[in-house]
Amino acid sequence: MAKTYDYLFKLLLIGDSGVGKTCVLFRFSEDAFNSTFISTIGIDFKIRTIELDGKRIKLQIWDTAGQERFRTITTAYYRGAMGIMLVYDITNEKSFDNIRNWIRNIEEHASADVEKMILGNKCDVNDKRQVSKERGEKLALDYGIKFMETSAKANINVENAFYTLARDIKAKMDKKLEGNSPQGSNQGVKITPDQQKRSSFFRCVLL
């Protein structure tokens, strides 16, 4: 059977339990929100195919358990990931502080050139905010990682986040292909300006 996509990207969602990883994934894959999800046991995944620069990209997105007892299972999935989203809850200071630990996990278990992004989730609950947007931006800047605030419930920036991560992965792949093509060959992939890595900070506004 003919392949229905041009690229397959494996993405991973990591972060403390209860930060809304499953809700973010469900919003992106099903365009729906369910506030009654129980904590993910081990690992689960969803698939969605998107189009970027005229190419069909199949995203295989793995949702990991945040609890310590599942850590051995979930770290095994880091290795093949091409993109990792680190999620914290803006109403939970501890989940933000633990992002540094999650980054250490990535450094230990994931590929050195994996694309990363930090998501401050639940930005619709501004009255209970414990972590300012500026602190999220600074942490991301410290590690050279892109940052967005999201809300799975209000559907803020979820689509933007996945598309941005996928675009960065594709740009990196295209550059590698271009670098591997013989000198003078026309077989290399041409990088268009909008594919180049850009720093994107999206303000969380509930309309």
Swiss-Prot record:
GO terms for biological process: autophagy; axonogenesis; cellular response to insulin stimulus; cilium assembly; endocytic recycling; exocytosis; Golgi organization; neurotransmitter receptor transport to postsynaptic membrane. A lipid is attached at C204 (S-geranylgeranyl cysteine). Residues 205-207 form a propeptide. A motif (Switch 2) lies at residues 63-80. Regulated by guanine nucleotide exchange factors (GEFs) such as RAB3IP/Rabin8 and RPGR which promote the exchange of bound GDP for free GTP, GTPase activating proteins (GAPs) which increase the GTP hydrolysis activity, and GDP dissociation inhibitors (GDIs) which inhibit the dissociation of the nucleotide from the GTPase. Activated in response to insulin. The keyword Cell membrane applies. GTP binds at residues 17-23, 35, 39-40, 66, 121-122, 124, 152-153. One of its GO terms (molecular function) is GDP binding. InterPro entries: P-loop_NTPase, Small_GTP-bd, Small_GTPase, Small_GTPase_Rab. PROSITE patterns: RAB (PS51419). This is Ras-related protein Rab-8A. The lineage of its organism: Eukaryota, Metazoa, Chordata, Craniata, Vertebrata.
